[in-house]
A protein has these predicted regions:
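C-terminal cap of thioredoxin/glutaredoxin-like
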Residues: 45-146
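Structural alpha/beta surface segment adjacent to cysteine/selenocysteine redox centers
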Residues: 1-54, 59
Length: 146
C-alpha cells in the first residue's frame, strides 16, 4: 500500500543531501516572527521545494528565496534566520519535544485549551510516536479529552 505522494527524485541527482533538518526548522520559526500564519506557509513551501522541486532546504539561500516566494520580507527573514531569538525558540521547541519523549517522526501531539478558562495555559498530550493505527490514535485522543 502506498500513499500516492508525489516525489521528484531529481533531488538525489542535483542536490547534496544533508542530514540535518535544523535549518528548515529554524526557517519555520523565523517565518512565524513575521506572521503566525507564515509558519504553516513556510512549512508547506519547504515541503514542496524539497519533494516536488528538488530544492535543498538545508541551504540558507534556498530558505531565504522561499521566504520571498511566500510573500515574506526576505531581508528581515534572512536576519531572523540566524538570530539569537530564533536559536532560543528552536532550542525551547526541541526541549519541549524531549519532554514528550519524541525521538523521531512521525509524532503527533495534541494541544487543547479549556473552553471554560480562556486564560489557562494550553495542555498537551502525546497521541502518536511512530506509526499508530487509527483505532489506537482515536482511543488516545478520547482519553486526553476526558
Amino acid at each position: 500500500e502506498t500513499t500516492g505522494a508525489t516525489f521528484n527524485f531529481d533531488f538525489w541527482r542535483t542536490c547534496e543531501p544533508r542530514r540535518s533538518t535544523y535549518p528548515a526548522c529554524r526557517a519555520v520559526i523565523a517565518a512565524g516572527l513575521q506572521t503566525l500564519d507564515a509558519r504553516r506557509a513556510m512549512y508547506d513551501a519547504i515541503q514542496n521545494a524539497y519533494f516536488l522541486d528538488a530544492r535543498n532546504p538545508s541551504l540558507s539561500e534556498e530558505l531565504i528565496s522561499i521566504s520571498g516566494e511566500i510573500g515574506l520580507d526576505s531581508t528581515l527573514f534572512a536576519d531572523d534566520l540566524g538570530s539569537n531569538e530564533v536559536a532560543s525558540r528552536f532550542a525551547a521547541e526541541r526541549q519541549a519535544c524531549r519532554n514528550f519523549g519524541v525521538t523521531g517522526f512521525p509524532t503527533l501531539i495534541w494541544s487543547w485549551q479549556s473552553a471554560d478558562d480562556e486564560d489557562a495555559s494550553p495542555r498537551y498530550g502525546l497521541l502518536a510516536a511512530g506509526y499508530t493505527n487509527l483505532d489506537t490514535l482515536l482511543s488516545r485522543w478520547r482519553s486526553l479529552m476526558n
